[in-house]
Regions:
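Residue-level signature of catalytic and energy-coupling elements of molecular machines
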Residues: 11, 17, 76, 89, ...
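Canonical P-loop GTPase G-domain recognition
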Residues: 102, 112-171
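P-loop NTPase switch module centered on the Walker A-proximal segment
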Residues: 1-70, 78
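Flexible loop/turn segments at secondary-structure boundaries
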Residues: 14, 84, 150-151
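Conserved helix-loop functional segments at active or binding sites
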Residues: 23, 27, 84, 169
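Flexible glycine-/small-residue-rich
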Residues: 6-8, 57, 108, 143-146
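Conserved Switch II/interswitch segment of TRAFAC-class P-loop GTPases
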Residues: 51, 58-62, 70-121
Length: 171
């Protein structure tokens, strides 16, 4: 099984992406609770290309620092097209570098809200610069909308498939 951390700034769509992956690939989605009311971690296990993948994220940014230990097989970095890379994005990249976790793909989320192609391209360049500063190169970028894909919009669902393809190709 490949353990894939879904990382990025808070509210950039990590949990929505996991829910969408679970729906499209008929995964087994679970919520693991910190206590009786607080979700600690959301995860889904899917089968793809003969392999099993466990995608997970933590509800609080501190969950990554407290629970990741470098045994993860990879990470997907989620960045909102409307916000670009923010402090949580930078921290996720730093944490991956510190723990030796390879970022297998970058998912540019919420693309349905940005009409200007140039703005998305500029934001992608900012993300690429951030990755390059940490020695991370040749990482595929996939544009999409976890929300619309989760609602069954086929053009957006296909982009989730491209994301899973990119992760699988890494291995």
């Amino acid at each position: 099984m490949k353990n894939i951390a879904v990382m990025g700034h808070i509210d950039h769509g990590k949990t929505t992406l996991i829910s969408t992956i679970s729906r499209i690939f008929e995964g087994d989605k679970k919520e693991i609770f910190k206590n009786s009311e607080t979700v600690l971690r959301t995860e889904t296990e899917i089968e793809f290309g003969g392999d099993t993948y466990l995608f997970f994220d933590y509800e609080e940014d501190s969950g990554y620092e407290e629970n990741l230990n470098g045994t993860e097989d990879g990470a997907v970095l989620v960045v909102s097209a409307t916000d670009g890379p923010l402090m949580g994005t930078e921290r996720a990249v730093e944490l991956c570098e510190e723990l030796g976790i390879e970022i297998t793909a970058v998912f540019i989320n919420s693309c349905e809200w940005v009409d200007d192609e140039e703005l998305i391209e500029l934001m992608e360049m900012d993300v690429q610069d951030l990755l390059s500063e940490h020695g991370m190169e040749d990482i595929p970028f996939i544009r999409g909308s976890a929300r619309l894909a989760g609602m069954g919009y086929s053009g957006w669902e296909e982009r989730i498939g491209k994301l899973i393809d990119a992760v699988a190709e890494h291995f």
